[in-house]
Amino acid sequence: EDAQVTDLPDHEQEHLAXHKIAPXLAEFAY
């Protein structure tokens, strides 16, 4: 759904995906 995501590097896509799936866990991971 986010057209911008596909333009980002893989690690950035994973970063955004983590925030969408588990925001609380993403805060610890990053």
From Swiss-Prot:
Keywords on record: Acute phase, Glycoprotein, Protease inhibitor, Secreted, Serine protease inhibitor
GO biological process terms, semicolon-separated: acute-phase response
GO molecular function, one term: serine-type endopeptidase inhibitor activity
Keyword Repressor: no
Tissue: Plasma.
Keyword Secreted: yes
Superkingdom, taxonomy of origin: Eukaryota
Subcellular location as annotated: Secreted
PTM comment text: N-glycosylated; contains bi- and triantennary glycans.
TM annotation in the entry: none
Main location: secreted
One GO CC term on file: extracellular region
Family: Belongs to the serpin family.
Domain comment as written in the entry: The reactive center loop (RCL) extends out from the body of the protein and directs binding to the target protease. The protease cleaves the serpin at the reactive site within the RCL, establishing a covalent linkage between the carboxyl group of the serpin reactive site and the serine hydroxyl of the protease. The resulting inactive serpin-protease complex is highly stable.
UniProt protein name: Alpha-1-antiproteinase
